[in-house]
């Protein structure tokens, strides 16, 4: 019984570490299109206006927790989603609160 409990706790901790990932927090509204390689693609919206012209910041700021540079993703950037706040089915929109740009 005790060994089973320790094993279960170990598995849960292992999965939690796998899911944690590296990311920085930046609140943005985004829609996700699933790619074949399972990395999500992000398209940023501001109201009804699609933000095609987002540029990466010239001098990135650094998040103290994750050590990830804070860039604004462009339409063509591929990102790894780390944390999702909620999904709105009627708008097919997801609020992503943490992500990393994949280079």
From Swiss-Prot:
Superkingdom assignment: Eukaryota
Tissue: Expressed by the venom gland.
Subcellular location(s) per record: Secreted
Claim: Metal-binding is one of the keywords in the record: no
Keyword set includes Transferase: no
Organism lineage string: Eukaryota, Metazoa, Ecdysozoa, Arthropoda, Myriapoda
Family from the record: Belongs to the scoloptoxin-24 family.
Gene Ontology terms, MF aspect: toxin activity
Post-translational modification: Contains 1 disulfide bond.
Keyword entries, A-Z: Disulfide bond, Secreted, Signal, Toxin
Name under which the protein is recorded: U-scoloptoxin(24)-Er1a
Signal sequence residues: 1-23
One term under GO cellular component: extracellular region
């Amino acid at each position: 019984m005790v060994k089973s409990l320790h094993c279960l706790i170990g598995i849960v901790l292992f999965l939690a570490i796998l899911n944690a990932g590296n990311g920085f927090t930046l609140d943005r509204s985004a829609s996700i299109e699933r790619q074949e390689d399972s990395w999500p693609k992000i398209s940023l919206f501001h109201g009804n206006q699609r933000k095609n012209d987002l540029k990466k910041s010239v001098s990135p700021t650094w998040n103290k927790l994750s050590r990830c540079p804070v860039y604004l993703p462009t339409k063509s950037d591929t990102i790894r989603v780390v944390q999702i706040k909620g999904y709105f089915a009627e708008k097919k929109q997801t609020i992503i609160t943490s992500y990393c740009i994949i280079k």
